[in-house]
Amino acid sequence: MSVVESSLPGVLRERASFQPNDKALTFIDYERSWDGVEETLTWSQLYRRTLNLAAQLREHGSTGDRALILAPQSLDYVVSFIASLQAGIVAVPLSIPQGGAHDERTVSVFADTAPAIVLTASSVVDNVVEYVQPQPGQNAPAVIEVDRLDLDARPSSGSRSAAHGHPDILYLQYTSGSTRTPAGVMVSNKNLFANFEQIMTSYYGVYGKVAPPGSTVVSWLPFYHDMGFVLGLILPILAGIPAVLTSPIGFLQRPARWIQMLASNTLAFTAAPNFAFDLASRKTKDEDMEGLDLGGVHGILNGSERVQPVTLKRFIDRFAPFNLDPKAIRPSYGMAEATVYVATRKAGQPPKIVQFDPQKLPDGQAERTESDGGTPLVSYGIVDTQLVRIVDPDTGIERPAGTIGEIWVHGDNVAIGYWQKPEATERTFSATIVNPSEGTPAGPWLRTGDSGFLSEGELFIMGRIKDLLIVYGRNHSPDDIEATIQTISPGRCAAIAVSEHGAEKLVAIIELKKKDESDDEAAERLGFVKREVTSAISKSHGLSVADLVLVSPGSIPITTSGKIRRAQCVELYRQDEFTRLDA
């Protein structure tokens, strides 16, 4: 079935009509059992549950109202999202607030969206209701425990009709930036279908932009994050690919599960952030893979954070004995503001690593080098599904090839803006290029906030502009420094710049596991790590480390999507709140 721009519930209705008894979604719950408890919905079952829940939602909300989804990863989460769209209500996928702790992010989103409905589950409702306060002049939102409803009953004829008039906004995707003022990206139907078309072109173009029979989506990524949401919830429906899903907890408990799922599902397509590739490489044992073969994997997308060359090599080497084809690994670039996807290399090519002169990168020049000691960067390919330009963020003038600037994006996939933040929307989504080159529109352009460059037509990414370390007047990418550290210590680490006496100094924070060893052995091991890291950073980046902080795993603050909160690291360091292993 070809998908033209219609609606997500409309496509689901078609699938329920033409392939009612085919498997749609399978969720494996590893929290109920270590071996996993499976629940499967066919297309007709998924559609029936969607219709029944949508009918309930219409009793509590009107077109354009917001429904917050604060529920565990489950099939009910998927049903909650599609039912919101079916009812003409703007869906807001979120993570569950942490029990026993005040969750500023959840409070901020409630205040920002003034929801009419909160969709949750009986297992977490006590946590959720703490945040359900009516906004001034409004009623408190209706709290619906989806798992307590009978959604398998025959839908009434009235429930089959779509909402009268759909809002321009389908859903709000809250970014994982500031906890106090999270920004809700407004995604429209046009954005979603444009990005779906781009995704199918880039990842299934060799099959005529259609998933071949036998294809499967495999995902453990959280539904509240843009990559997990599109991969695990949107793509299966629009592309008609059955999905096998689990939760982030299922993966983190035992990373080998992800690789086993890839091997046991045909033509598997999956995605994960860079750290997950490291974790799977280190935590998957040969006995976990006994009798399994990865030769049939269609694609493993590495995205959400900058892809590290050392991670790719480690992952490919680890699973080569199990027939993993390096060409299946797809480093990819995207963000919620572009719906999710922006760039990847063409299918049929293994990841490409290019060395650049480390002395020139801090001065904004990207020059390829063949010599040892270059800075390795991953290519994201030639972008051809949307427009990408490298621009001077201060002047709005395009930068020539081989010159570092801000990555700007233009296409129908670029979202409407930030919910109720007109100034931030104007600043981020309405940028204009001064004296644009031929074939380049003046605007509007999305300012990604990412620094990068084009070399021989290919896109390379340096990192977040706001995270750049400016030491002695030169720009250094924290991602590059962290990649150097991880060649010595593969755990999580953070490179930050801290102001002292009017100058920026480099501080590295490294998570290390404690071992069963004597105090003398521990001191020797920690001293070795410090010496090796200090030497490697000096050699690779020409920088001296002012302070190297060794901490226990879990000490470095991260976002809900696993990215390092560097600004929070700086504050923790200033307040001397890191507990040092070598204190």
From Swiss-Prot:
InterPro entries: AMP-bd_C, AMP-bd_C_sf, AMP-dep_synth/lig_dom, ANL_N_sf, FAAL/FAAC. Its main location: membrane. One of its GO terms (molecular function) is ligase activity. One of its GO terms (biological process) is fatty acid biosynthetic process. The chain crosses the membrane at residues 77-97, 109-129, 229-249. Keywords: Cell membrane, Fatty acid metabolism, Ligase, Lipid metabolism, Membrane, Transmembrane, Transmembrane helix. It holds the Pfam family AMP-binding. It is an enzyme of class 6 (ligase). Residues 353-375 are annotated as: Disordered. GO terms for cellular component: plasma membrane. Its EC number is 6.2.1.-. It is a multi-pass membrane protein. It is found in: Cell membrane. Belongs to the ATP-dependent AMP-binding enzyme family. This is Putative fatty-acid--CoA ligase fadD25. It comes from Mycobacterium tuberculosis (strain CDC 1551 / Oshkosh). The gene is fadD25.
